[in-house]
């Protein structure tokens, strides 16, 4: 996001929250696509993050206000996430992860699918590794995700932090990350 790309994720706990926080930390914009209506008391522990996203991006949903989250709402949310994106990055997915639904939607919509490889000894990466075996692009550094879009969208790849910089920023929020120009 610091390179000028828009980050889109699901606003959930874990990797979704990390993606939103990372986008904002890099000085970028992020969109959280919700699997419920606005005003719903879902994942109240993420309310501070949603408030921050409202200031640095947008909360998006196709559901009427106060529609509760449910098993049927998340696949619909995942379809919107992939539909709003040029490419989809799956960081960690077990064999039954909802991220695989998003990946399937992305492929059906003609989007690029990227995956971070993980240990073959961990079931937490079974789905991610299957995506790679099925032809997803492998990503081990953030710049790999954006390099194919840089010219078309005028992205500044010099502003893409390395994995090491992201890890340092997670440990020390005051750590310097490449910042997007705010001209």
Please identify what each model-predicted range represents.
Residues 1-183:
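Glycine-biased, small-residue-rich flexible motifs in mid-sequence functional cores and linkers
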């Amino acid at each position: 996001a610091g390179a000028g790309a828009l980050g889109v994720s699901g606003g959930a706990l874990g990797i979704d929250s990390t993606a939103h926080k990372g986008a904002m930390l890099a000085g970028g914009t992020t969109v959280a696509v919700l699997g419920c209506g606005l005003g719903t008391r879902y994942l109240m522990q993420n309310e501070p993050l949603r408030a921050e996203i409202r200031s640095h991006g947008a909360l998006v949903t196709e559901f009427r206000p106060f529609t509760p989250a449910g098993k049927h709402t998340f696949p619909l949310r995942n379809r919107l996430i992939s539909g709003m994106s040029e490419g989809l990055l799956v960081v960690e997915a077990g064999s039954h992860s909802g991220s695989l639904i998003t990946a399937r939607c992305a492929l059906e919509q003609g989007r690029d699918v990227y995956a971070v490889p993980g240990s073959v000894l961990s079931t937490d990466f079974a789905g991610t590794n299957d995506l790679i075996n099925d032809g997803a692009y492998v990503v081990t550094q953030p710049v790999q995700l954006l390099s194919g879009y840089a010219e078309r969208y005028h992205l500044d790849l010099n502003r893409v932090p390395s994995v090491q910089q992201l890890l340092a920023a997670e440990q020390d929020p005051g750590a310097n990350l490449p910042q997007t120009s705010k001209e």
